[in-house]
From Swiss-Prot:
This is Delta(14)-sterol reductase. Its main location: membrane. Reduces the C14=C15 double bond of 4,4-dimethyl-cholesta-8,14,24-trienol to produce 4,4-dimethyl-cholesta-8,24-dienol. NADP(+) binds at K354, R358, L382, W387, N394, Y395, D434, C438, L439, V440, K441, Y442, Y449. Gene3D superfamilies: 1.20.120.1630. The gene is erg24. The keyword Transmembrane applies.
Amino acid sequence: MSAVRNRNNVEKQSNNGAQLTEVQKKELADLQKVHPANEFGGIIGTFLLTFILPVVVYWIWASIEFNNGYLLRPETLSVEGVKAFLAQLYHYVITYAYPTKEAAIIYFSWFGFQAFLQHVVPGRKVLGSPLPGGARLEYTLNGWASWWITLIVIPIAIYFGLFKATILIDNYAPMMTVVNIWSFVFTFLLKIHAKLKGEEERMSGHFFYDFWMGFARNPRIGSFDLKLFCEARPGLILWVLMNFSIAAKQLEVYGEISLSVILVCCFHFWYIADYYYHEEAILTTMDIITEKFGYMLVYGDLSWVPFTYCFQCYYLYKHLVNGAPLHISIGYAIFVVSLKCFGFYLFRWVNSQKHDFRRNPEAPVWGKPAEFILTKRGTKLLCSGFWGICRHLNYTGDIILSWAWCLPCQFDSLAPYFYGIYFTSLDLHRCWRDHNACLVKYGDDWRAYCKRVPYNFIPGLI
């Protein structure tokens, strides 16, 4: 009965009311089949990831906060050594990261403020990519306006003494714990929401696996899209504001903002400003089109992004060299900026080319008619421009970008390189998942595309 209700619920919004094709009917039927628990290490892998990832973040935070940025580790690899290490980490978390009323007020005020902007700020109405069954959801793109409203309101509030510029870094650890708890609660609420609305799809029947992967693809309250909001608002802007708060703390404590901190703050600000300027492009990403909304995305969007992506700034504030903040030369800074610009423009140009092609397949690519493979499903796989060189040059640019963000920290510790290591692993895994998904989706057409464009990241190498 639940499967029938789910299917009928989707069919009501499918294909804008038009008659469903046989392919679309099959797509909808496939959503209600039991799906294998075979991603992210299956049932065991998703269970471990759910609980280990927050521990990893606490570990790096404690290393930066209490060990001058050097990674904490057991004195010995014996059972007693590991137990002592975990006991020390537990002490740091319980003593300094215990959730406080102030941290909860700060975060939920922030979350509510961003939800308010998402709901009331006018924006351009656009249709998302076709979903199984042909449905195209309408989105209001007001991120660019909300971004600038936030950047105006926050400094005004600081100027009039509503809170200090250092409020975020002063409450970093307790607020992180608040958000970790909220991520679990929010995911359970998504489970209830999907069940009540009959929107569950691609379920495996294994609790922890489905908790991690998600329940519904596009959960909404009215026209308010929960996944797009969490993906694009509270975590991303909080990440930038956390950097600014750390810079303010460095100025307060040491009387200066180091060039390294300025570079990292500018890099991240530029990246997020560009993200909102090209906001429509998110609607063609794997997260929005394919992924269900579960703990993986909830925790990633709300906690992982703002509390780990600021680690470079955090490290540069806490890591002292001869009692003073780390300084880099102008020449080194120019090298880092050049690398960042190369990675950024590669990332942006490649993604924009794909997005423009999806909007208008007739538009020329590099001055020539676009070449593509027309799949049996009717989808067009772009085979010219950047997408005729490698299948994921956008990931290449993103990886270069991630390491450029870490380089201002120089090389005393691995802690600030957490982002580069993580993001490289993420993109490699995402490439593998994307390949498998496309192989299932397009079959021989995808094999033909891979034969025509054999490399993923670097032409002639990989």
